[in-house]
Structure formats: C-alpha cells, structure tokens
Amino acid sequence: MPKVIGLTGGIASGKSTVSELLSVFGFKVVDADKAAREAVKKGSKGLAQVREVFGDEAIDENGEMNRRYMGDLVFNHPEKRLELNAIIHPIVRDIMEEEKQEYLKQGYNVIMDIPLLFENELENTVDEVWVVYTSESIQMDRLMQRNNLSLEDAKARVYSQISIDKKSRMADHVIDNLGDKLELKQNLERLLEEEGYIEKPNYGEED
C-alpha cells in the first residue's frame, strides 16, 4: 500500500535537494511552496482576496502578488501573517490533497514537501515525517549566501521557525545534511534501503 511521507526541515536545510533526489527514486512530490504560488497566481480568486484584505500595494505592476512587500509585511507583523494564511492555507490544502489523491490512485508513494509541517500541526495528516537536518550555523551561512541577507536577518528567519533540533526529535526519520551533496545522497539512499523503498545493491562474489 502506498505511503504518504511528510518531508520537512528548517529553512535552508537542503529539503529541496532531498525532494529532487526522492523524485529520481520514483516518489511523487507534492510541493507546498508550489501550491502556495498557484493559490495566488495572477487572475486567481486567492490573489483577489489578498488585494481586498491588504490593498493595492500587495499587487505589483504585472498584476501578480508583490512578494517583497508581502514578505516584509507578514514577517514584521505576525497578525498580518495570520490574515494571509487564512486566505492561502485552505486553497493550498485543496490543491495538495487533489494532487496527493491522484498519485495514490496510481499506486505511487507520495512525498508531501511542507516546510512548516510542524508549525502548522500537519504531522497527523501523513504516515511518517522525515526531517532534513543541518546545523543552525550552516542554515545561516546558506541563507546569507543564497538570499544575500545580513547575519541578523538570517538569524531572524531561522529563529522564526521551530528549531531544527526539536523537529528532528519529533520526526520518524532524520536525513543528515551536514556534509556535501554526495554525502546527502548516500544518507538518503541508506534510509530508503533500510525502509525497503529501494533494494540494497548486491555485489555478489567473484568466481
């Protein structure tokens, strides 16, 4: 019977890389970030609701959501984050549920790629939770390089989520991403072998 696995981690923990690798191994990935973008795409009901609640500043000159404006707004005003989530989350849930059910019907194991799985208390909607683990210092380094953030901004984003250590304690399985991409792939393969998703290589004996 196909399984539904929740994949999560801290910001800049390497979760996207793990998602890509899992799709190579035959899993179907349902991406919460992708669903969130679809929920407020140009011309959508979701975007119309955003404009109604947050005003014209929330929409850029191309008729799309002004992500920089909205990002700063919700990051600095928690009550605004709740208002935005109240618009987006129900739409995202519907998009993801439809995609998940379609894959399950086809017999695939499904990865629900959800960055804020624990924060939104969604762990009971999946069969297992896998956490991609790295250290907070690596998270901050990656954020500063990837997003061109100051150390203070990187810290603020890391600390706005449940800590990676706590998430790891709450997970069914932890995927170590303290090393490079090759080590990450090897760690993931080991987990997939142990859980029976892929076969262990049988090198046999030479004659």
Curated annotation (Swiss-Prot):
One of its GO terms (biological process) is coenzyme A biosynthetic process. It comes from the Bacteria. One of its GO terms (molecular function) is dephospho-CoA kinase activity. CDD domains: DPCK (cd02022). It is found in: Cytoplasm. ATP binds at A12, S13, G14, K15, S16, T17. Keywords: ATP-binding, Coenzyme A biosynthesis, Cytoplasm, Kinase, Nucleotide-binding, Transferase. InterPro entries: Depp_CoAkinase, P-loop_NTPase. Its EC number is 2.7.1.24. Signal peptide: none annotated. GO terms for cellular component: cytoplasm. The keyword Cytoplasm applies. It holds the Pfam family CoaE. It catalyses: 3'-dephospho-CoA + ATP = ADP + CoA + H(+). Pathway: Cofactor biosynthesis; coenzyme A biosynthesis; CoA from (R)-pantothenate: step 5/5. Gene3D superfamilies: P-loop containing nucleotide triphosphate hydrolases (3.40.50.300). Its main location: cytoplasm. Residues 4-203 form the DPCK domain. Belongs to the CoaE family. Catalyzes the phosphorylation of the 3'-hydroxyl group of dephosphocoenzyme A to form coenzyme A. This is Dephospho-CoA kinase. The lineage of its organism: Bacteria, Bacillati, Bacillota, Bacilli, Bacillales.
